[in-house]
Swiss-Prot record:
GO terms for molecular function: thiamine transmembrane transporter activity. Thiamine-binding protein that interacts with the energy-coupling factor (ECF) ABC-transporter complex. Unlike classic ABC transporters this ECF transporter provides the energy necessary to transport a number of different substrates. The substrates themselves are bound by transmembrane, not extracytoplasmic soluble proteins and transport it into cells. Binds thiamine with a dissociation constant of 0.5 nM. Upon coexpression with its energy-coupling factor (ECF) ABC-transporter complex EcfA1A2T in Lactococcus lactis subsp. The keyword Isomerase does not apply. This is Thiamine transporter ThiT. It is a multi-pass membrane protein. In Lactococcus lactis subsp. cremoris (strain NZ9000) forms a stable energy-coupling factor (ECF) transporter complex probably composed of a membrane-embedded substrate-binding protein (S component), two ATP-binding proteins (A components) and a transmembrane protein (T component). Belongs to the vitamin uptake transporter (VUT/ECF) (TC 2.A.88) family. Thiamine transporter subfamily. One of its GO terms (cellular component) is plasma membrane. Disulfide bonds: none annotated.
């Protein structure tokens, strides 16, 4: 039975990673050039609140590897091995930090405290998203500085691009997760109660 539950978590993690990758192909560039909406963060957020930090981190890692192979290398977004590792497996894995609020979220959602549950979910989303884009911000300064518009400070340019992407993606994810919490709260509660993170009280 225990092995079956673990298999279910692994399958959910793999499905979420694949779904996040699929969402990446939806056009997602907004007004200012290079600022993007990251739809893939939405399923990772759901998994983080449903299963915890470790499954979410693994889903992020797999998503990062897929994005590296399917888009990064072929799309010219990998300048060298160090930058590729930093901006794909590492940055995407950090999205799993959304699961830091898993235990508190589960306690709230199981107690039908929707306002508290929303607050914990939103806090986790902010942590995970900004952790990811902090890595992109550093990489933007170190590796992408030469591509900044002439006369533009590389720190400022990277902050605008990556900070803007983080902000837009965070707002999008919070809105969608908020709607899902209202219309389908059961989506965030695993029937088997299994996680590889801190257990809800």
């Amino acid at each position: 039975m225990q092995q079956h539950k673990q298999l279910v978590v692994i399958l959910e993690t793999a499905i979420i990673a694949a779904f996040a990758m699929a969402l990446t192909y939806i056009p997602h560039t907004t007004g200012v050039s290079a600022i993007e909406l990251n739809y893939g963060l939405i399923p990772i957020a759901v998994l983080a609140m449903r299963r915890g930090l470790v499954p979410a981190a693994w889903a992020g890692f797999v998503w990062g590897i897929l994005d590296l192979i399917l888009r990064g290398i072929g799309g010219g977004s990998v300048l060298n091995p160090l930058q590729g590792i930093l901006e794909y497996p590492i940055a995407f894995t950090l999205v799993g930090l959304m699961g830091l609020t898993f235990a508190s979220f589960q306690k709230a959602v199981r107690g039908s405290e929707k306002v508290k549950a929303s607050g914990y979910a939103f806090a986790g989303i902010i942590i995970g998203t900004f952790a990811k884009y902090f890595i992109h911000f550093i990489a933007g300064v170190v590796f992408w500085g030469a591509y900044a518009p002439k006369g533009t400070n590389v720190w400022v340019y990277s902050l605008i691009v990556n900070g803007g992407s983080a902000l837009f993606s965070t707002v999008l994810t919070i809105v969608v997760v908020g709607v899902l919490l209202t219309v389908a709260p059961q989506l965030f509660v695993a029937k088997d109660g299994k996680s590889f993170s801190t257990k809800a009280a």
